[in-house]
């Protein structure tokens, strides 16, 4: 009878009786294609020259390709260079040189931005003007200090008061009523001594006049404030904050919100124009008819005559100034392609006034303070009578309500953009605000809050999908924190008057330490204050103004100071998570005493790295520099080893929503893509754990990866092993002595023959377990030839021209084989064509299909698994054979037989195309070994055997 043996690829499963005829114990330099064997050839376009720098091979890391260029990114001697597609060096100046302690983990790109992930952080390089411009891990944070100007005089309304005008403007605005003092006020008795020094209620407003007086005072305040705001100036307290505006409009690296105490503790200072400092019978003297002189903006005096109850408003009318405190502006200039401006945002005016309540009284000697000067005062005298010591007592929020109002202020509106080219170091300038923006501030663009963009990121790898950079295996280095010059205004006096020894209450800030409660334990960050360490800061500022850290996990801030005697002093403030802002802060209510926060010691050690190994950070679309909050996802509890995408939906009928897979130490996870391009949900799909991240390879509709027991692919939601046939021990080829001896060198052999025999011996000697091989190999997808190549990149001890054994998987035929390839340095999957680089620096682009025009003669060998010709296992004899092939070169065939499937007996070596009669012994089992010489156009289809059964069972 005849048996046709069609070969099925490499198989190492232990049970010889379970495998089909045609399975192979050895398949070297041959691969299965459409059911036939053909030479295993790596075809493609070689680069015209190897990648070398001064004779040193540059290892290819990435192919940076856009519609306009294709560059090979490679590393040599810890420096990254770029090469043109032909292999020529693009520039002798490296893109980036690394310390020898750092190593590059991955390289990716989005548009013209190259992203280099290294052990020392994330690095960037922008292509433009014929070269790459290196950018460090983060833009420098330019420290800007804000302050306010002196008050501007203005032509305020006189509100019915008879007053001489001036083109130079005045500092006060008036409002006169139609009532006399007796119509409006009830006088309150004050002890004489207290009336000279204490803040006391001195006048109350009669109940029937409270509404009218309240309306008159607010009319005075509102029209004056509107005039100031229309000029782009400020009259009340507010917060200011700045951030970087990126090329795509994103906002990053927000500053601390800085509270500008234009006037504290009250929001407005409105004074009685009728009440003097004099008293009669412990009652304040008031005057319906009073004339005095005031000064205009240049000190010229003019007359004012009061006829009825009147009030004057001493408003703050100030510019917002800014100062660049460091030299980082020059460093920021390097980022001008990414950072387009420094945008400044403010809040609407914040007051402690409760406008729902009526004004009921006035107080004597009530003190307000203004930033930069201290006590706020405006009095007038005439004939020994002084007015201006009695101020309107505005109904106000409770202390707690005002504190909460300040803490929960979260809406910041844009009033100014500063171009990087306009920034000047160490120079105080007026902030060029948009006047209309200040007047209608709540209609302006609102600041989008920050989420940890000051932190430095470290990753184990990167993956670009959907124009977004995905970083995985994360660590973050916490931001060192803002120093005092960024958190506090740039003016150091606030609560100041002549009765205080102010130097006793001023401190030089040396450093600021913040503690954070993280998943990695308590962390400490430290910021040295080089600027404020030379300045005496009002203790009132330190205790009451904002202390902020841009991370809600922060719980304490310790400020280390020097007092006026140069003694070390430490103040520790509790930080509370902000309700709206991403951060934690402490802020007083302008009654806090700094001494209550004083401590003897604060022990810490700087520890600022947080492990985030199960996080994936996804950037904004087409912006590899910014990772928004909604792009940060947690995947399981393990460490993410790699990411890959698939093009097929995991659930048929759904919106293709799980295109990205994360390979973690606790399994494989699928991530759902939201309409915004970020990942809205994450689901586990397999317990399989990838054991070799270099094996993760995207195929057309699946992803391939290696585990410690197989190489598998995940398609849809199913994980399928591709290497079950390789899970077993290798066959002892040395038991086939005659076959093995054929490839030993003889004296008559030419160098070419010896080289060929050495290659065959290398294939025979490859006894490495494929499963172990998968743990160290690099996998690439040869799309043109529909096969997977598993390449050994660990053969560092071999010469660059030596051959190494690789594994090949034919996707069409589901068949494995081995083949020889020149010693591989690395290989990368770069859509649409992979690249192989050999250890001599030469590079092959696998951009061609199988070359059927190649006239080179290739050599290959196969050894079958046990051949069985009947189920009864009775002895048979092989009496003839025919080779079915298209080659003109005749194969050499060795036949072996066995009765126990263990010990193999040599039957013979046959060199003809066919044989009709062969005298052989009878055996239950057989093996065939073939040595073939084939050109690329040739195929070996099958071996047809003539079988005669010698014995049968009775």
Predicted features by range, described:
Residues 1-92, 144-215, 227, 232, ...:
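N-terminal beta-propeller domains
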Residues 249-280, 284, 525-532, 543, ...:
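Short Trp-Ser/Thr-centered turn/loop motifs at beta-strand boundaries
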Residues 217-232, 284-336:
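Conserved aromatic anchor
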Residues 99-109, 311, 451-460, 904-948:
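Beta-sandwich interaction modules
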Residues 103-156, 160, 342, 346-408:
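Hydrophobic or amphipathic alpha-helical targeting/insertion segments
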Residues 51-54, 95-99, 634, 684-688, ...:
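Surface loop/turn motifs at the tips and blade-to-blade linkers of beta-strand repeat domains
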Residues 3-6, 109-113, 468, 645-854:
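Beta-sheet-dominated scaffold domains
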Residues 344, 850-857, 871-885, 933-954:
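Exposed low-complexity, polar/acidic, P/S/T/G-rich flexible segments that act as propeptides
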């Amino acid at each position: 009878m005849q048996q046709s043996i069609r070969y099925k690829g490499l198989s190492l499963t232990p049970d010889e009786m379970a495998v089909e005829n045609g399975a192979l114990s050895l398949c070297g330099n041959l691969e299965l294609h459409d059911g036939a064997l053909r030479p295993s050839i790596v075809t493609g376009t070689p680069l015209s020259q190897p990648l070398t720098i001064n004779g040193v091979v540059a290892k290819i890391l990435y192919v940076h390709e856009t519609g306009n260029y294709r560059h090979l990114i490679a590393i040599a001697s810890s420096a990254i260079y770029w090469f043109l597609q032909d292999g020529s060096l693009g520039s002798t100046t490296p893109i980036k040189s690394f310390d020898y302690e750092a190593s590059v983990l991955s390289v990716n790109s989005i548009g013209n931005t190259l992203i280099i992930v290294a052990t020392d952080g994330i690095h960037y390089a922008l292509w433009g003007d014929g070269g790459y411009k290196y950018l460090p891990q983060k833009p420098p944070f330019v420290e800007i200090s804000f302050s306010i100007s002196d008050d501007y005089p203005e032509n305020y309304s006189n509100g019915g008061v008879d007053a001489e005008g001036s083109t130079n403007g005045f500092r006060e605005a008036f409002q006169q009523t139609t009532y006399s003092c007796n119509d409006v006020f009830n006088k309150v008795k004050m002890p004489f001594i207290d009336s000279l020094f204490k803040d006391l209620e001195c006048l109350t407003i009669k109940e029937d006049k409270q509404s009218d007086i309240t309306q008159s005072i607010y009319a005075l305040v509102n029209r004056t404030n509107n005039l100031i705001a229309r000029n782009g100036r400020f009259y009340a307290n507010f917060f200011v904050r700045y951030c970087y505006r990126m090329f795509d409009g994103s906002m990053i690296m927000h500053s601390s919100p800085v509270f500008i105490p234009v006037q504290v503790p009250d929001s407005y200072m409105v004074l009685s124009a009728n009440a003097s400092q004099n008293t009669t019978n412990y009652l304040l003297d008031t005057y319906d008819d009073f004339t005095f002189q005031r000064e205009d903006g240049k000190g010229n005096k003019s007359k004012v005559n009061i006829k009825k109850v009147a009030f004057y408003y001493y408003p703050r009318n100030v510019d917002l100034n800014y100062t660049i405190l460091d030299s980082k502006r020059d460093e920021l200039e390097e980022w001008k392609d990414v950072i387009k401006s420094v945008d400044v945002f403010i809040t609407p005016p914040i007051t402690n006034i409760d406008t729902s309540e009526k004004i009921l009284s006035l107080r004597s000697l009530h003190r307000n303070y203004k930033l930069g000067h201290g006590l706020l005062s405006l009095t007038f005298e005439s004939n020994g009578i002084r007015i201006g010591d009695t101020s309107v007592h505005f109904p106000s929020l409770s202390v707690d309500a005002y504190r909460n109002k300040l803490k929960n202020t979260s809406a910041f509106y844009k009033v100014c953009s500063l171009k990087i080219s306009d920034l000047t170091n160490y120079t105080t300038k007026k902030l060029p605000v948009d006047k209309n923006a200040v007047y209608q501030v709540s209609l302006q663009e609102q600041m989008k809050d920050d989420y940890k963009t000051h932190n430095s990121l470290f990753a184990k790898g990167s993956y670009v999908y959907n124009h977004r950079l995905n970083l995985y295996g994360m660590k973050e280095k916490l931001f060192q924190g803002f120093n005092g010059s960024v958190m506090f205004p740039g003016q150091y006096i606030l609560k100041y008057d002549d009765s205080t020894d102010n130097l006793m209450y001023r401190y030089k800030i040396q450093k600021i330490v913040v503690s954070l409660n993280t998943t990695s334990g308590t962390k400490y960050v430290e910021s040295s204050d080089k600027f404020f360490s030379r300045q005496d800061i009002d203790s009132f500022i330190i205790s009451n103004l904002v202390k902020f850290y841009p991370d809600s996990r922060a719980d304490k801030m310790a400020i280390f100071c020097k007092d006026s005697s140069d003694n070390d002093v430490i103040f520790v403030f509790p930080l509370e998570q902000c309700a709206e802002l991403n951060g934690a802060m402490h802020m007083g209510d302008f009654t806090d005493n700094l001494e209550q926060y004083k401590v003897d010691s604060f022990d810490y050690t700087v520890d600022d790295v947080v492990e985030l190994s199960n996080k994936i950070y996804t950037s904004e679309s087409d912006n590899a520099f910014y990772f928004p909050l909604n792009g940060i996802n947690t995947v399981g509890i393990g460490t993410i080893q790699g990411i890959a995408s698939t093009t097929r939906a995991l659930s048929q009928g759904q919106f293709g929503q799980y295109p990205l897979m994360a390979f973690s130490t606790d399994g494989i996870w699928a991530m759902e893509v939201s309409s915004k391009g970020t990942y809205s949900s994450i689901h586990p799909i397999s317990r399989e754990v990838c054991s070799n991240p270099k094996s993760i390879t995207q195929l057309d509709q699946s992803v391939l990866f290696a585990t410690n027991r197989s190489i598998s692919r995940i398609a849809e939601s199913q994980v399928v092993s591709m290497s079950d046939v390789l899970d077993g021990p290798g066959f002892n080829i040395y038991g086939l002595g005659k076959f093995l001896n054929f490839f030993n060198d003889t004296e008559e052999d030419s160098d070419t023959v010896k080289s060929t025999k050495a290659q065959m011996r290398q294939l025979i000697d490859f006894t490495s377990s494929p499963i172990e091989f998968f743990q160290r190999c690099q996998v690439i997808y040869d799309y043109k030839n529909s096969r997977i190549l598993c390449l050994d990149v660990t053969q560092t001890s071999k010469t660059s021209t030596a051959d190494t054994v690789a594994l090949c998987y034919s996707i069409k035929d589901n068949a494995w084989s081995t083949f020889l390839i020149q010693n591989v340095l690395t290989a990368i999957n770069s859509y649409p064509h992979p690249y192989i680089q050999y250890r001599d620096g030469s590079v092959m682009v696998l951009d061609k299909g199988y070359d059927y025009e190649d006239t080179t003669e290739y050599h290959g060998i196969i050894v079958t698994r046990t051949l069985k010709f009947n189920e009864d296992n009775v002895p048979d004899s092989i009496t003839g054979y025919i080779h079915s092939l298209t080659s003109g070169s005749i194969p050499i065939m060795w036949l072996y037989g066995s009765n126990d499937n263990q010990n193999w007996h040599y039957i013979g070596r046959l060199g003809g195309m066919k044989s009709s009669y062969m005298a052989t012994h009878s055996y239950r089992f057989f093996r065939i070994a073939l040595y073939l010489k084939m050109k690329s156009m040739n195929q070996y289809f099958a071996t047809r055997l003539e079988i005669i059964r010698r014995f049968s069972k009775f």
